[in-house]
Amino acid sequence: MMLRVLLVAILALAHGYVAPLGFARSSSPALRRRALAPLAQQPSTDDVKAAETNAEAEDGSGGLRQLLGLKGASAGDEKAFLNWKIRLQLTKPATWVPLIWGVACGAAASGNFHALWNLFGDAPTTDSVGVVATDAVKAFCAMVLAGPFMCGFTQTINDWFDRELDAINEPYRPIPSGAISELEVYSQIAFLLVGSIVVALQLDGWAGNDWPVITAIAAFGSFVAYIYSAPPLKLKANGWTGTYALGSSYIALPWWCGHAMFNAGSISAPEVVLTILYSIAGLGIAIVNDFKSIEGDRALGMNSLPVAFGIDTAKWICVASIDVTQLGVAAYLWAIGETWYAAVLAGLVLPQMFSQISFLQDPVNNDVKYQAAAQPFLVFGILTTALAVGHHTF
C-alpha cells in the first residue's frame, strides 16, 4: 500500500508540469446549458471518463490524490478542521510544480543566486553559509507566492467557473459535489488574491526593489487568471488566446518573479523576449492536452486548435511551436557566444523530436506517452536557457 501511494506521489510531481495545461475548460453559461443537457441524458466519453476516474480512488490512493488535486480523489472529509482538505484540493497542489520550477529558472537567470555549490570548487569564493541559506529562503518564499498563492488562486477561480462542466466530468470535485459552499469558495478566492499581493509586497521589500516589480507581476498574473476563466473575455474559449495565456503564466511570469527576487535591475529585453518565446512552446504543450477532448470541446462551443483546424493540422502546429521555439532559442544562445549552453539545449530537443514520431501518428492515444517521454527534456531545456542568461552579460 505504501509503495502504491509513493508511486502516485512521484507520478503526480512528474505530471505536474503539464497537468495544468489540461485542466477543465468551459465556455459561456449559455453554451454550457445547451451542451450539458444532451450530454447528461446519454452515456458519453466524458461520463465514462468520470466513472473511471471515480473508480481509481478504490486503489487506495484516493486520499493522496485528493490532497494533490488529481483525478480519482476520494470524497471530502467533513470532519477536517476548517475543511482544509477540500480547500487544499481546490488549489490543485500538483499544478504548482511548473511555477515553482519557473521561479528557480528565474533565480538562475539573475546571475545573483548563491547556491550550495558556490561554497565548493577550485575557484575562491566569498560566499558564506549565511548568504547561501538566505538566498535559499528567498527562493522558497518566492515559490510559495507562485505556487500556493498565485496558482492556488488560478485553480480555485477556474474551478468555480467550470463547476457545471465538472459536475459531469469530475462530480467528486469540491464545488460540484457540494463539499464546499459558495461562500467558502468566495472567501478562498479573496484570501489567495489578497494574500498574493501582500506576500509580493513583502518580497519586493526584502529584495530591495525600488519599484514593486514582484507585486506588479502578481497583480498582472491575477488579472490574466481571471480573464482566462471568467466571462466576458474567457480567454480559454479560444484556442490561441487560451493556450498562450497558460504558457506565459506558467513559464514567463514565475521566471520574472524569480529573477526580480535576486536582481530586478538586470532583467534585460533579450531575457524578456526569450521567456515570451518559451511561452509559445507552452502553447504547444497545451495543445497536446486538447486532442482527447475534441468532441466535448465542440459540444461546449470551445474553439480549441484541434477543433478549429482538425487533428492533422493541429498536431503539426503543436510540435512546430515546441521545436521551432527551442531551436530558435538555441540559435540565439549560439549567436551571443553561449555555445555550450546552445549545444546542450539543441541536444535536449532531439529526444523530444524522437518522441514526436509516435505522437504524430496518433496524437489522441499517444498524448500521455509523449508528455511523459518528452516534457522532462523541455523542462531542463528551460533551465539550461536560464543558466545561459545568468552566465551572459547583456
Regions found by a protein language model. Name each.
Residues M1-L31:
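N-terminal chloroplast transit peptides
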Residues R4, R32, G60-L64:
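Short amphipathic alpha-helical segments that mediate assembly, nucleic-acid/protein binding
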Residues L11-L13, A37-P38, C151, L348:
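A composition/secondary-structure signal for short, hydrophobic, low-basic-content segments
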Residues A19-A55:
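N-terminal, immediately post-signal peptide pro-regions of secreted/luminal proteins
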Residues Q42-F394:
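Multi-pass alpha-helical membrane architecture of UbiA-family
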